């Protein structure tokens, strides 16, 4: 049986890590595409030369022609300018929309049967554009945001409580921006509610526990900006790559994972016609199901606010 083919569009920081992780996990053969000649070839050669040490047989190729992504099973798009200090994800929209247009046309022409995972910012707008231009079914075009935002939230909870990140379940919904919605009510450490654990840590002081959680939420919402501020020359790339690979693996290996995915809603959660981060089952058919659950009044208000921000951003492209 032929190995799966993974096409990575954009040979920057995230693209390089994606190529390495795809190879390490033996997800399939990798084509790394970039418009800069030599860049994807150099990165893939460098990763491939580690194959005897890292013990993988996946073939890695660098490319400057969209024809080389022909027949890809899955395409992960990172192309676009990264954020710099002081910029919001939304500031990138005009430049990255032009890039996304040509990328989407390339995917439509050469990988018409592929699943597409978009990482490029501003995410909610870029994934909308990609689906519109490719014309692919919405089950095959999705955005990576929630997996990363949820991972950040879970990490901050684990560090606060001094527990293993493996045991923390936390989910973030909504848009990939400052209005994202961490679902505090269902956050737990192996089934034990996080709020209860924080209260116990602070000797039953409910007000203190709320204050601590508010700080964790705020840090989660600004986590991307925190990394940008420290790096000064770009934005996060290790964690976004890992998050996109989790999604790709769920599809390629038909894992039926329930993950927060930026998906096109058709009435779910009261939203129609917009890409928003919601829980989805990811498997061999891409987004196989959007999983709805009831939000309480506070969560609903935050979610509505987040959706309004997404609508404003997406509508600004029209």
Swiss-Prot record:
One of the entry's Gene Ontology molecular-function terms is:
L-lactate dehydrogenase activity
- Active site at 176
Q: Does the keyword NAD apply?
A: yes
Q: What class of enzyme is it?
A: oxidoreductase
Disulphide linkage map: none
- Could you tell me which Pfam families the record lists for this protein? Ldh_1_C, Ldh_1_N
What chemistry does it catalyse, as a reaction equation? Answer: (S)-malate + NAD(+) = oxaloacetate + NADH + H(+)
Sites where the protein binds substrate? 83, 89, 121, 152
EC assignment: the record states 1.1.1.37
UniProt xrefs under HAMAP family? Malate_dehydrog_3
User: What family is this protein classified in?
Assistant: Belongs to the LDH/MDH superfamily. MDH type 3 family.
Name of this protein? Malate dehydrogenase
């Amino acid at each position: 049986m032929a190995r799966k083919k993974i096409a990575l569009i954009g040979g920057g920081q995230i693209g390089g890590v994606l190529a390495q992780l795809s190879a390490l996990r033996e997800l399939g053969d990798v084509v790394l595409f970039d418009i800069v000649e030599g860049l994807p070839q150099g990165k893939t050669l460098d990763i491939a030369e580690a194959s005897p040490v890292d013990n993988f047989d996946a073939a890695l190729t660098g490319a400057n022609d969209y024809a080389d992504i022909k027949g890809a099973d899955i395409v992960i798009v990172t192309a676009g300018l990264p954020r710099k200090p002081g910029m919001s994800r939304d500031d990138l929209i005009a430049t990255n929309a032009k890039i996304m247009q040509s990328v989407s046309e390339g995917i439509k022409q050469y990988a018409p049967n592929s699943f597409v995972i978009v990482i490029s910012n501003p995410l909610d707008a870029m994934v909308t554009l990609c689906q519109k231009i490719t014309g692919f079914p919405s089950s095959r075009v999705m955005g990576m945001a929630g997996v990363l935002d949820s991972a950040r939230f879970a990490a901050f909870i684990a560090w606060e409580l001094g527990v293993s990140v493996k045991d923390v379940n936390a989910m973030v919904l909504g848009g990939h921006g400052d209005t994202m919605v961490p679902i505090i009510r269902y956050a737990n450490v192996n089934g034990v509610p996080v709020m209860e654990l924080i209260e116990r840590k602070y000797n039953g002081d409910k007000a203190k526990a709320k204050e601590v959680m508010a700080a964790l939420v705020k840090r989660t919402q600004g986590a991307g900006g925190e990394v940008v501020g420290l790096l000064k020359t770009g934005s996060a790339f290790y964690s976004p790559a890992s998050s996109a690979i989790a999604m790709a693996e769920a599809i390629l290996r038909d894992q039926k994972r329930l993950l927060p995915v930026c998906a096109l809603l058709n009435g779910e959660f009261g939203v129609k016609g917009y890409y928003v981060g919601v829980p989805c089952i990811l498997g061999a058919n891409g987004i196989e199901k959007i999983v709805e659950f009831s939000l309480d009044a506070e969560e609903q208000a935050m979610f509505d606010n987040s959706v309004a921000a997404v609508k404003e951003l997406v509508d600004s492209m029209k």
